[in-house]
């Protein structure tokens, strides 16, 4: 029997190895290793080590002491010591004495220790001198590890134990309220060690990490498998066990080769640990995403499964990428099968209860014959004496056709909380022991997205006093570990039961948590602030007692939306308008919130500086508007000429019998390159001329200076600056615009409003999509100011710097940080968050190598490399349009051959022909971009690279390929095709993942888990460039995690499963994040609870049918190709028209016709989108809709067309003009008089209301929808009169910004939040703006 044996009814067995069944005990195994390898290091703890010989001799002395105190084979000895060498020495001593150890975790309550010792009839307990007093109530004899190590005058002989005697006892949660002890014999454990290691293959040369508590039986894999082969155990300190990032580094430093861990811990490691030879996982389910990340060629990654009752593990699987994660097949000499409730054997593929048999199955529970008879039953399918006992695990499972076992969760009332097995009955029994409680039932159910223990309590009929929840918590915390204390207690008259008499847990899970509470239980408010607070809380929580020490989240059940509502209601009272949502999260308790209400706030920016609005000059407004109206057609025409000129060239030189298509293509590319070069020259020249003589200051809105600035700003947008991002050419371009740029400056990408007022000194590093906003409009004025970045300063990605700001030498501004106007960041300081605050002093430069030198020759060479590369890339991505032309022409001549009679027919005809041509162009572009990236950068590894080195150059080239391709493929984002596109680029993307407009992506470094969601404008894992070096780290997003709009995810982030990162927020340190958490803000703030999403069926959210996938695929396919088809169709119409004009008149007249055609094209693009919006959607209303529904597809389609057709071709040129509000009204926006809009970023137009004289600066706007849990939620945004919204500020739906309010840069107004009138706010989340 050397192979797996599987019969047709689901009985599978591991390989048969009789040599693993030896007549031995653990003491024999250790003694053999100690004799064979006496000088080999056995244990390492910090700077202490013990060899196997030393450990054996020292443990032997302790064992002899125990023998002198009467300890014999068969006895039980408790073990309660801090982790370390002394603990393992005591464990071995008990083993050598012939007794069995009963281990306890360091944090186990003394009452529970006493219960277990009494139940096990332990003869004594080993502990420390310090802990001795905690066991005063324990009747058993207690020995300290110090006294057991005193020298002996003479040697003491030790009695020999037998294989059938106990080796150790592990206590787990018991369903009757009493913990149950599982006795593992010497035979059980010795067989297990040899069986499992025959597959794991731990060797003498290995260095094994020891991190588990000895009360958790996975620790025996760490300890005793090492003892079996003579490996070295490295004992982790307690502080390291809970710090995954530091642990990861320590594993590398200590060159650990074997890691036994739970999957949750491994998932939190920020990077690979190459020296790990074996990774053995167990204790909980292992997600596929973890396998994708860690199942690498240099690791052997195993998944083990087994209850304590079968000795640590019973099955094992070598995990490989691309294979489903299972618990594998039985270990050698073990067997598994699946039965139904009638204990009948089930066929392959059928789900039932998993059962285990073999020589390592325990004999039962200590002193619990009834429970033993229920769980350990006779095995009718046994083939030997060793298989006669069958253990019923209580886990649901099935066995597939390959003999792999799939574990599907618990079948009984046992649950897992944070990795701990918990019998609900034990909690219920502890509750029933409390006076006044008649019956109790405990269930596990999700509340606000988090699994929580809910206790339902029926009081005794003749109870003398009411049940006090606080007293209940205190009582239980004395008897149970913290993870077993229920999160919530519900008082009910009677616990529902089934006909069988058992508790009806299904009814409890469905029962609303709305028990009525007597208001007399509430505290009485003692001052006006408390009266107002209690009145609002009573409205929000109508059935809850309100006490001053009640926690808003834990006791009252508050969540994110209720937090916003509470603060908004309090702000309606002028004296409390300074309160913030952040205050609530920090204070939490009702009394602490009331105390904050009484604090005197600091004077805000509004109070001190900008309380008065300035009247707008209507004459200036209309004169400026007329001037803008004259220039806009020219701007649109210049923009359209960039693609229409080569389009025209191609068609002008084709069509005749002697025309050469290759010649036409070459000439078109030459024209395309010329247009690109000319656009840079034009934008530089015109901007320098327009801004001549304009300096820092305040200028009237709509005045002459404003018009000159507006026109210069608009014309600078015509050149494709994205081609220069991250290169030294960008510095050259900014210099040409008037900026003062020093030597060896690195700029990834910036948005600069006034280059002539920008100074960047030597060695400065600037991240991606940084806003240098030294121009803004507020209160009827254009405000211009300088920005000065001094030597070696640093600005992180997505940061915003306002006018008149200075960063001193080596000042460090973190990502997603706002530096408000008139701010100086001192030398060497690190500022973070919005509003920015000092968080430390820079020492990062000391960690980096010396800045690589940039010689003059290399600088010139880089100019050449970046310039030629940029033009080559631009041409490569223009080339796919020519096959589309050929296809259109071929379809025109060979398939349709129709001669339209007018311009509208021509446009429609060529638009239809262009649809398949556009699809082909998209596919060619996708293939070219993914292929070129792999050629340019075949392999990219984690590390640090010089920005003036080959890796950076190649990485830049690959990044530019991606950036340039997105000019064509932008429509792929937020569609069903986006994950495939990211996979083509090299990212690891799980099933059913949604990806919107993610930026900064390094595909090779990105892993997205299954069913994760990346929202709009997320900066996702971009590289950090600082001090002349580029750092690359892997970024991982866990399964079902959500990253909100405009969030910043730093490279190296490892986001656990089911985590939500809020809008315009960033993540905390990896070690602070755990499954199921919600973080928002900058800096990140942990949200205790968030608003529960409306429930929809799975087929509308996460698990759609094939039909819905096909329908969405079709609609989104059209949405991708239609913008390009529209451009090609209109392009044909314009080209044919202009060729006709040139042939009949002259080139000058043709250029005029081309300009007019460009204007009509821009207006037409807007009108088409507006028409489609009203036909397909009608008027937007507040609502929610699951993702896999027609409304969402159509709405997202309209948004995509608006962003890809209407904005770039028309509305962008209306930003900052009096005309933009008019066109937004056509789309449905309710917008007042004299509104200034430097943004067109609005989606659900009808849900936006903007008051008179409001001012929206660039990249700001209302956000009327969010996706959470695959549900699109739409709400109203109301902005009052005379409101100022600064750069990159977002107002979420159901929020209200009252009259005369000011929102600073990078500010987030939360859902349901109300910003009071005549106040100034800044930050994410918003806080009163106190300018310092």
Curated annotation (Swiss-Prot):
Gene Ontology MF, one: ligase activity
Start and end residues of each Carrier domain: 524-601
Summary of the knockout phenotype: Cells lacking this gene show a similar growth as wild-type in static or shaken cultures but show slightly higher biofilm formation.
An example Gene Ontology CC term for this record: plasma membrane
Annotated phenotype, changing residue 221 to A: Loss of amino acid adenylation activity
UniProt site (Important for substrate specificity): 218
Reactions the enzyme catalyzes: n L-ornithine + n ATP + H2O = N(5)-(L-ornithyl)-[N(5)-(L-ornithyl)]n-1 + n AMP + n diphosphate + n H(+); n D-ornithine + n ATP + H2O = N(5)-(D-ornithyl)-[N(5)-(D-ornithyl)]n-1 + n AMP + n diphosphate + n H(+)
Alphabetical UniProt keywords: Cell membrane, Ligase, Membrane, Phosphopantetheine, Phosphoprotein, Transmembrane, Transmembrane helix
GO biological process entries: amino acid activation for nonribosomal peptide biosynthetic process; secondary metabolite biosynthetic process
Enzyme class: ligase
Phenotype upon changing residue 217 to A: Loss of amino acid adenylation activity
Topological relation to the membrane, as annotated: Multi-pass membrane protein
Residues that bind D-ornithine: 221, 304, 306, 308, 313
Membrane-spanning ranges: 629-649, 664-684, 868-888, 908-928, 1120-1140, 1151-1171
Entry-linked PANTHER family: FATTY ACID SYNTHASE (PTHR45527:SF1), NONRIBOSOMAL PEPTIDE SYNTHETASE (PTHR45527)
Entry text on domains: Consists of three domains: an N-terminal adenylation domain, a carrier domain with pantetheinylation motif, and a C-terminal transmembrane domain.
Name by which UniProt lists this protein: Delta-poly-L-ornithine synthetase
Organism: Acinetobacter baumannii (strain AB307-0294)
Lineage per the UniProt record: Bacteria, Pseudomonadati, Pseudomonadota, Gammaproteobacteria, Moraxellales
């Amino acid at each position: 029997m050397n192979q797996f044996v599987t019969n047709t009814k689901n009985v599978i067995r591991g390989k048969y190895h009789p040599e693993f069944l030896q007549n031995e005990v653990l003491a024999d195994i250790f003694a053999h290793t100690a004799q064979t390898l006496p000088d080999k290091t056995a244990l390492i703890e910090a700077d202490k080590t013990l060899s196997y010989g030393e450990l054996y001799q020292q443990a032997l002395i302790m064992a002899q002491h125990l023998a002198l105190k009467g300890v014999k084979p068969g006895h039980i000895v408790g073990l309660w010591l801090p982790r370390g060498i002394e603990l393992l020495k005591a464990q071995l001593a008990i083993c050598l004495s012939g007794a069995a150890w009963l281990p306890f975790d360091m944090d186990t309550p003394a009452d529970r220790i006493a219960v277990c010792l009494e139940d096990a009839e332990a003869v004594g307990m080993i502990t420390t001198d310090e802990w001795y007093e905690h066991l005063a109530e324990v009747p058993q004899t207690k020995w300290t590890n110090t006294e057991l190590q005193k020298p002996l005058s003479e040697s003491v002989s030790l009695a020999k134990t037998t294989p059938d005697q106990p080796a150790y006892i592990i206590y787990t949660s018991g369903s009757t309220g009493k913990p149950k002890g599982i006795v593992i014999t010497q035979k059980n454990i010795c067989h297990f060690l040899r069986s499992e290691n025959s597959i794991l293959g731990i060797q003498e040369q290995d260095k094994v990490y020891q991190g588990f508590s000895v009360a958790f039986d996975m620790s025996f894999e760490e300890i005793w498998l090492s003892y079996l082969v003579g490996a070295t155990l490295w004992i982790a300190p307690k502080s390291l066990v809970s710090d995954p990032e530091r642990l990861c580094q320590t594993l590398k430093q200590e060159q650990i080769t074997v890691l036994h861990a739970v999957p949750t811990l491994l998932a939190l490691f920020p990077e690979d640990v190459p020296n790990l030879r074996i990774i053995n996982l167990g204790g909980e389910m292992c997600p596929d995403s973890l396998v994708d990340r860690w199942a690498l060629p240099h690791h052997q990654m195993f998944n083990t499964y087994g209850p304590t009752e079968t000795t640590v593990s019973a099955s094992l699987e070598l995990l490989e990428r691309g294979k489903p994660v299972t618990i594998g097949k039985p270990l050698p000499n073990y067997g598994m099968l699946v039965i139904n409730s009638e204990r009948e054997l089930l066929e392959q593929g059928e789900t039932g209860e998993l059962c285990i048999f073999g020589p390592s199955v325990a004999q039962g529970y200590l002193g619990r014959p009834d429970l033993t008879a229920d769980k350990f039953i006779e095995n009718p399918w046994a083939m030997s004496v060793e298989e006669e006992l069958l253990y019923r695990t209580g886990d649901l499972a099935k066995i597939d056709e390959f003999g792999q076992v799939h574990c599907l969760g618990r079948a009984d009332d046992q649950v897992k909380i944070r990795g701990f097995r918990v019998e609900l009955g034990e909690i219920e029994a502890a509750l029933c022991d409390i006076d006044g409680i008649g019956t109790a039932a405990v269930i596990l159910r999700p509340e606000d997205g988090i699994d929580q223990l809910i206790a339902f309590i029926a009081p005794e009929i003749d109870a003398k006093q009411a049940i006090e929840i606080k007293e209940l918590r205190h009582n239980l915390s004395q008897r149970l570990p913290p993870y077993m204390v229920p999160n919530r207690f519900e008082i009910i008259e009677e616990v529902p039961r089934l006909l069988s008499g058992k508790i009806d847990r299904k009814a409890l899970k469905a029962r609303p948590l709305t028990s009525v509470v007597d208001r007399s239980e509430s505290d009485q408010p003692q001052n006006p602030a408390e009266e107002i607070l209690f009145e609002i809380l009573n409205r929000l929580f109508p059935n809850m007692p309100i006490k001053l020490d009640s926690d808003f989240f834990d006791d009252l059940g508050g969540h994110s939306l209720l937090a916003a509502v509470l603060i908004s209601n309090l702000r309606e009272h002028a004296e409390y308008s300074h309160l913030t949502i952040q205050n609530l999260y920090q204070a939490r308790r009702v009394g602490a919130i009331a105390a904050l209400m009484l604090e005197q706030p600091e004077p805000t920016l509004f109070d001190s500086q900008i309380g008065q609005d300035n009247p707008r000059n209507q004459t200036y407004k209309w004169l400026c508007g007329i001037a803008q109206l004259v220039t806009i057609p020219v701007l649109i025409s210049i923009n359209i000429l960039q693609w229409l000129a080569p389009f025209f060239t191609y068609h002008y030189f084709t069509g005749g019998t002697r025309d050469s298509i290759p010649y036409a293509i070459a000439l078109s590319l030459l024209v395309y390159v010329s247009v690109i070069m000319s656009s840079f020259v034009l934008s530089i020249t015109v901007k320098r001329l327009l801004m001549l003589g304009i300096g820092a200051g305040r200028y009237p809105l709509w005045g002459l200076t404003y018009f000159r600035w507006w026109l210069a700003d608009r014309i600078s947008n015509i050149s494709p600056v994205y081609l220069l991002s991250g290169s030294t050419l960008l510095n050259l371009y900014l210099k040409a615009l008037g900026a003062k740029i020093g030597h060896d400056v690195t700029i990834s990408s910036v948005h600069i409003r006034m280059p002539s007022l920008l100074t960047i000194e030597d060695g400065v590093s600037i991240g991606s999509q940084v806003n240098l906003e030294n121009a803004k409009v507020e209160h009827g004025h254009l405000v211009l100011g300088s920005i000065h970045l001094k030597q070696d300063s640093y600005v992180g990605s997505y940061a915003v710097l306002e006018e008149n700001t200075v960063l001193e030498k080596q000042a460090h501004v973190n990502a997603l940080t706002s530096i408000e106007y008139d701010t100086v960041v001192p030398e060497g300081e690190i500022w973070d968050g919005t509003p920015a605050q000092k968080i430390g002093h820079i020492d990062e430069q000391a960690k980096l190598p010396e800045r690589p030198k940039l010689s003059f020759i290399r600088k010139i060479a880089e100019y050449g490399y970046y310039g030629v590369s940029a033009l080559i890339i631009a041409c490569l991505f223009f080339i796919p349009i020519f096959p589309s032309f050929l296809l259109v022409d071929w379809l025109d001549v060979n398939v349709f051959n129709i001669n339209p009679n007018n311009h509208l027919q021509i446009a429609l005809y060529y638009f239809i022909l262009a649809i398949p041509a556009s699809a082909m162009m998209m596919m060619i572009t996708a293939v070219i971009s993914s292929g070129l990236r792999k050629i340019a950068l075949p392999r990219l590894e984690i590390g640090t690279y010089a920005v003036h080195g080959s890796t950076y150059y190649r990485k830049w080239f690959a990044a530019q390929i991606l950036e340039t391709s997105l000019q064509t493929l932008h429509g792929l984002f937020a569609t069903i095709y986006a994950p495939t596109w990211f996979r083509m680029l090299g990212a690891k993307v799980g099933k059913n993942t949604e990806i919107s407009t993610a930026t900064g992506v390094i595909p090779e470094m990105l892993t997205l888990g299954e069913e994760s969601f990346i929202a709009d404008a997320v900066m996702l894992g971009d590289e950090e460039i600082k001090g002349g070096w580029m750092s690359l780290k892997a970024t991982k997003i866990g399964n079902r995690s959500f990253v909100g709009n405009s969030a910043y995810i730093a490279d190296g982030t490892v986001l656990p499963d089911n985590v939500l990162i809020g809008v315009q927020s960033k993540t905390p340190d990896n070690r602070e994040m755990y499954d199921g958490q919600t973080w928002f803000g900058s800096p990140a703030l942990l949200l205790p609870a968030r608003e529960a999403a409306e429930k929809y069926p799975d087929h509308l959210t996460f698990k759609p049918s094939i039909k819905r996938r096909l329908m969405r695929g079709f609609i989104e396919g059209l949405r991708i190709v239609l913008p390009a088809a529209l451009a090609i169709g209109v392009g044909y119409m314009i080209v044919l028209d202009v060729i006709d004009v040139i042939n009949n008149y002259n080139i000058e007249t043709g250029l005029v016709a081309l300009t007019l055609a460009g204007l009509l094209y821009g207006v037409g693009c807007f009108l088409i989108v507006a028409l489609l919006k009203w036909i397909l959607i009608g008027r937007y209303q507040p609502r929610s809709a699951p993702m896999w529904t027609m409304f969402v597809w159509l709405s997202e389609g309209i948004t995509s067309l608006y962003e890809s057709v209407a904005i770039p071709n028309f509305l962008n040129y209306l930003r900052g003009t009096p005309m933009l509000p008019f066109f937004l009204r056509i789309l449905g926006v309710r917008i007042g008089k004299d509104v200034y809009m430097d943004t067109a970023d609005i989606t659900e137009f009808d849900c936006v209301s903007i008051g008179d004289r409001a001012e929206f600066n660039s990249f700001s706007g209302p956000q009327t929808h969010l996706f959470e849990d695959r549900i699109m939620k739409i709400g109203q945004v109301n902005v009052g009169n005379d409101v100022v919204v600064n750069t990159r500020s977002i107002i979420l739906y159901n929020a209200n910004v009252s009259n005369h309010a000011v929102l600073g840069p990078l500010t987030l107004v939360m859902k349901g939040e109300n910003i009071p009138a005549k106040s100034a706010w800044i930050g994410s989340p918003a806080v009163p703006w106190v300018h310092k």
